[in-house]
Amino acid sequence: MKKLNTIILILLGMICTQLYAVQLNSIYPLKPNDSEAFYFTPENYPIKADGKMDVSDALQAAINQVKKEKNFGILFIPEGKYKISKTIYIPTAIRLIGYGKNRPEFILAKNSPGFQEEVADDKGKAKYMFWFTGAVVKEGEKPRDAGASTFYSAMSNINLRIEDGNPHAVALRTHFAQHSFISYVAVYIGKGKAGLFDVGNELENVAFYGGDYGIYTTKASPGWPVMMVDSYFEGQRVAALRCQESGLAMVNLYAKNVPAVFDIDPNYCDKLFLENSYFENVSGPAVVITNENNSNNQITFRNVYCKNVPTLAKYTRSNTATHVAHKIYKVKSYDHGLQMDNMVDMPEYETLVDIEPIQKMPVAQLMDIPAPVSYTHLRAHETLRH
């Protein structure tokens, strides 16, 4: 009987993993041996990965050490729970990468100082767990936000958690550019504000639970579009994503139990492209378009599967909406913006919708690349140098 229960649990886990588009396991189960990297371990820094000791200062010192000694590089974070209570600044070209059987988790402690009130002079009106910056932030200095010249910064295979008593906490601020990314990160926002403010370059296999928003964002750094692949949003109180001029391109997004999936800021436009994605239990409109019939709007959905989503879109200026009577349906295509039938036609503002009812939600796409079983440093192979 015990064996049967174990098999059932494994099967249920496989179903949940496949259904929700993201993987929550550690993708680096083994320690990468890299002579050029730094390791955030008790042997190297005065820390304990027990979730009780505050490692904020030690973590910031380790990140700054990588920047000072190498200018660019990796700080590897072993499996464990790491308590922090202040903003950690990650300068240009520094990457935090977790490893171990389970992903390491950084936890913002309950009632951490400064996370209770809105930060009026901050762009995101919030305080951040991790803020990607353009340079090392010295004590007493105002941070210089990451921008169009912030390359190679990243966080991967690490989970983040916001504990109670931090209503204006946001886990990540990521306004970086080329070769920068957030990947294999699950953010447990709880009663905090959001998982991420200001998107940058690429997000892959990211999950957001709770919060007012999973992501809220303005436009990306100048010249750099943003791609988000394999993402999951659940239980946000206002919207999965709040955006203005974000220019997001998204594939394999799953949003569940939210009032709205996309909420475009009042009087702003956006260019959103969404493909092969899933909406489930959306109580309000899936997308709120606040500035309809504007040439800067390009809202495009392709192959989006919906369950319990009675309103696909709301247009606030005209107080109209695109309603769908089917309980489960496929949005073969949805286009809002300027439309042309051919290259010589005059463009017109239109909303084009092609929907068909379906019997059940399909299984979400799942990455089938296996976890690594070994790690090889290229510099160890002398023949590759010639």
Show which residues each predicted segment covers.
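Short amphipathic alpha-helical "recognition" segments used for binding
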Residues: 6-7, 386
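A short, hydrophobic C-terminal helix/tail in secreted or cell-surface proteins
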Residues: 380-386
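Extracellular "leader-to-stem" segments immediately downstream of a signal peptide or signal-anchor
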Residues: 4-6, 16-76, 84, 89-164, ...
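Hydrophobic helical h-region of N-terminal Sec-dependent signal peptides
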Residues: 9-13
